[in-house]
A protein has these predicted regions:
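Active-site helix/loop of acyl-thioester processing domains in fatty-acid/polyketide metabolism
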Residues: 1, 5-10, 48-49, 107, ...
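HotDog/MaoC-like acyl-thioester-processing domains
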Residues: 4-96, 161, 166-169
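A general, composition-driven signal for non-globular sequence regions
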Residues: 21, 36-37, 129-131, 139
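Catalytic strand-loop segment that frames the active site of acyl-thioester-processing enzymes
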Residues: 61-134, 148
């Protein structure tokens, strides 16, 4: 289950070049028996031509029901992927309502995330949702688009980093 994602954009990502990503596991945290484990990864996205890093993607994945394996406390210290703070007080600075297609989760699924939670109504209901839900990364992409249009005057190069935590609606 995708828990957190942070993207740091080092350069403008070219649309006409071949890219590659190298992923490393940064940490695995045992949350305890029946609570699962967090798997923290770092992916460096680079140009295949010259190897120049273009972006760094940090992810936190929850392996549900895979906890209780650590024999020492060294696997129980959680790194900080996303700095938390108190929610802001008052009205939001900007509200952007973006309508998505009813089949958006099925289209995004073509990226390779075949979790049935995003496609199968029966599985979604068993998980406590009324219907299949949109992927977290797809929602993140929609939020990024909104930030670029509303806060960056349509200039994607002005967005240097975004971090999100995926939680229940």
């Amino acid at each position: 289950l995708h828990a957190e994602e942070s993207i740091e954009l080092l350069e403008t990502i070219p649309i006409n070049k071949t890219l590659f990503g190298k992923t490393t596991i940064e940490s695995i945290v045992d949350r305890g028996a029946g609570k699962g484990s967090f798997i923290y990864t770092k992916k460096v996205l680079s140009s295949k031509e010259d190897g120049k890093p273009l972006a760094i993607v940090y992810s936190n994945t929850l392996a549900r029901a895979d906890g209780g394996w650590a024999k020492t406390d060294s696997f129980k210290k959680k790194p900080t992927l996303i700095q938390t703070s108190n929610p802001p007080v008052g009205e939001p600075d900007i509200i952007d309502n973006i309508e998505t297609l009813p089949q958006a989760a099925l289209l995004y699924r073509l990226c390779g995330d075949m979790n049935p939670l995003h496609a199968d109504p029966v599985i979604a209901k068993k998980a406590g949702f009324n219907s299949p839900i949109l992927h977290g990364r797809c929602t993140m992409g929609i939020a990024m688009r909104s930030l670029i249009t509303k806060c960056c005057d349509f200039d994607a190069t002005r967005l240097a980093q975004i971090s999100v935590r995926f939680s229940s609606p």
